[in-house]
């Protein structure tokens, strides 16, 4: 039988082409140190910064320090059963979290795993936790207002969609309450809200979730929680996971409000990780890149251009101060990154002025462009009036005689302070804010006793709802004030019917 060399050659070539190796090549290393949520591994020579690494017990880690001899890894989850000598594998993937509509209404951890006991979250979309912020030409200036429902904020320090507004103050001054009230006010405003709780007690987070559920706000809110009992790596990751979820909606042309409660605890967690990873400490033992920790997070909040869908992420980061010291390291860092700050004063809170917003230290660098026309008209001089009232009030403590003009300013100032007070979880629609502030700035409240202002406001809003809903509708639809004569007549009618004259 003749052997056909060409046939044999063709068969061998075909076999080679069809050959599919069934082995998997992965780079592995050995754990050389484990403790306090940190591991060191030898042998992962090609690991990338931020790469996900897989431990023998199924836990995941994230490469942070790439050194000549080993890799410093933060462990995402339980590290108690990881031992020195265990094998660790590269995955070739960067840390990602699940994103999409199916997360709305759920409470998740920073890895996107549900913690609310309502079953699995079914989504096939993921986004990397670290992503570049939109560039200069991909952004648009902030022009649409984000209504918080709080008179003191919407009138004095307005927030726009796409802005970063820092909320700063001591503990127990009402920071979280402002955030929750703002989320409640986004009902029917076509906004998706993300509340990121960092290093809080689980009981506190539970209370906030129940409040959101009670007022129907969980229907458009995602809660990301890394409680105080969880390892530092999860506290460090939580804000990045939250903003990755927000970016998914922003690039679909939607508007998102994200609250970071609070970034002081994230900075402390990052300091702990950095010291354990043997990075050189700087001021207050924070690592040198603690500014970049927050800047790369907050720069991802933006109003993007129409080519990218015209969506926005509005960020409300929180910083907790010690004894009102806003010149501390982390506080000054975040003040310089954000587009303004709302400072909550301890003294104001204890004096019963709530929300305890210190108008003198608070500022919005977006300002009037984030207000509707009607609000601009009624609140234009409110800030200066309030500041001059505080100054005059300090002088009156000396007990000197006052002229009529000064007395009138003091009287108006006291009524302004009362009008800007607001009960918790009762955000006010912007049209109602405009009517009461109009009455205040046009002198209709000057004869009302200060102690009766709260009751006056309740009856005032009830009167407008019942007798003049068309005025509220005009403000809501046109975003402008109706004719002054119309408003004056309606307020005079209310005063004539009421017992406040």
UniProtKB/Swiss-Prot annotation:
Database matches in Gene3D superfamilies: 2.40.30.20, ATP synthase alpha/beta chain, C-terminal domain, P-loop containing nucleotide triphosphate hydrolases
Query: What is the name of this protein?
Result: ATP synthase subunit alpha
Hey, which family's this protein in? Belongs to the ATPase alpha/beta chains family.
Task: Describe its partners and assembly state.
Answer: F-type ATPases have 2 components, CF(1) - the catalytic core - and CF(0) - the membrane proton channel. CF(1) has five subunits: alpha(3), beta(3), gamma(1), delta(1), epsilon(1). CF(0) has three main subunits: a(1), b(2) and c(9-12). The alpha and beta chains form an alternating ring which encloses part of the gamma chain. CF(1) is attached to CF(0) by a central stalk formed by the gamma and epsilon chains, while a peripheral stalk is formed by the delta and b chains.
Q: Does the keyword ATP-binding apply?
A: yes
Positions marked as site (Required for activity): 362
Recorded catalytic reaction(s): these are:
ATP + H2O + 4 H(+)(in) = ADP + phosphate + 5 H(+)(out)
Q: Which gene encodes it?
A: atpA
Q: How does the record say this protein sits in the membrane?
A: Peripheral membrane protein
Summary of the function given for this chain in its UniProt record? Produces ATP from ADP in the presence of a proton gradient across the membrane. The alpha chain is a regulatory subunit.
Give the originating organism: Streptococcus pneumoniae (strain Hungary19A-6)
Under NCBIfam families, the record lists: atpA, PRK13343.1
- Assigned EC number: 7.1.2.2
């Amino acid at each position: 039988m003749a052997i056909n060399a060409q046939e044999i050659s063709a068969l061998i070539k075909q076999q080679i082409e069809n050959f599919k190796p069934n082995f998997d090549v992965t780079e592995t290393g050995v754990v050389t140190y484990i403790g306090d949520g940190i591991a060191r591994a030898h042998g992962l020579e090609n690991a990338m910064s931020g790469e996900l690494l897989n431990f023998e017990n199924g836990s995941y880690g994230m490469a942070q320090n790439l050194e000549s001899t080993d890799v410093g890894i933060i462990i995402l989850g339980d590290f108690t059963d990881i031992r020195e000598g265990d094998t660790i594998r590269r995955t070739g993937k960067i840390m990602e979290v699940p994103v999409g509509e199916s997360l709305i209404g759920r409470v998740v951890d920073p890895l996107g795993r549900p913690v609310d006991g309502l079953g699995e979250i079914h989504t096939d979309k993921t986004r990397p936790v670290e992503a570049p912020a939109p560039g200069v030409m991909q952004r648009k200036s902030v022009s649409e207002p984000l209504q918080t429902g709080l008179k003191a904020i919407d009138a004095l320090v307005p927030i726009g969609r796409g802005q970063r507004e820092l909320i700063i103050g001591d503990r127990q001054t009402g920071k979280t309450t402002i955030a929750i009230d703002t989320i409640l006010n986004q009902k029917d405003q076509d906004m998706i809200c993300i509340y990121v709780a960092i290093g809080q007690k689980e009981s506190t987070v539970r209370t906030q979730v129940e409040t959101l559920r009670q007022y129907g706000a969980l229907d458009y809110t995602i809660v990301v929680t890394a409680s105080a009992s969880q390892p530092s790596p999860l506290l460090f990751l939580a804000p990045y996971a939250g903003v990755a979820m927000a970016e998914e909606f922003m690039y679909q042309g939607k508007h998102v409000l994200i609250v970071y409660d609070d970034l002081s605890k994230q900075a402390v967690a990052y300091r702990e990780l950095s010291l354990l990873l043997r990075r050189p400490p700087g001021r207050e033992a924070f690592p040198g890149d603690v500014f970049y920790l927050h800047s790369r997070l907050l720069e991802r909040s933006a109003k993007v251009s129409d080519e990218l869908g015209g969506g926005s992420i509005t960020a409300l980061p929180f910083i907790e101060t010690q004894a009102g010291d806003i010149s501390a390291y982390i506080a000054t860092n975040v003040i310089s990154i954000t587009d303004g700050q709302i400072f909550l004063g301890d003294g104001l809170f204890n004096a019963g002025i709530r929300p305890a917003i210190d108008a003198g230290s608070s500022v919005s660098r977006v300002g009037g462009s984030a207000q509707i026309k009607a609000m601009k008209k009624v609140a234009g001089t409110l800030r200066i009036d309030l500041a001059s009232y505080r100054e005059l009030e300090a002088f009156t403590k000396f007990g000197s005689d006052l002229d009529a003009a000064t007395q009138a300013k003091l009287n108006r100032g006291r009524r302004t302070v009362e009008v800007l007070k607001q009960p918790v979880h009762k955000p006010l629609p912007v049209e109602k804010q405009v009517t009461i502030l109009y009455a205040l700035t046009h002198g209709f409240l000057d004869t009302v006793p200060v102690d009766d202002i709260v009751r006056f406001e309740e009856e005032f809003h009830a009167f407008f709802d019942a007798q003049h809903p068309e005025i509220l509708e005009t403000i809501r639809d046109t975003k402008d004030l109706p004719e002054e004569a119309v408003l004056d007549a309606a307020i005079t009618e209310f005063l004539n019917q009421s017992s406040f004259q």
